[in-house]
Amino acid sequence: GNCCIGNDTAYYWNGSSLKISPLEQVELLKKLYTNEFGFNEANVNAVKNAIMLSDNNSVKVYGKTGTGKIGNADVNGWFIGYIETVDNTYVFAINIKNEKNANGQKAIEITTSIFERMGIKIDL
């Protein structure tokens, strides 16, 4: 990202100059997943447990959603995370923008659709 959070530290991620691309988010999640940061493993596992959304034994979904608003309109939705299957781990970042109805739930729906086309059923 560009590290520009501005003066409003309570809401710097909404409507500010802060820019973090989906690719940068994916890279961050990959490093968290493999603990390339060298953090205490218990702390990394605590974060992973906190973002676990579902576990149906063959597919585990970890992630976080968000919604950016302008006035009452949902204009920016995102869903970032990773999915563990028996055979692989997939790291993803979905970001959608629109004049309205762009929210975290819509980003989940898009993500679910993409993985279902890959043959991976997500229970969220």
Language model features by range: what are they?
Residues 1-29, 34:
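Mid-domain, small-residue-enriched loop/turn segments at the edges of structured enzyme/sensor domains
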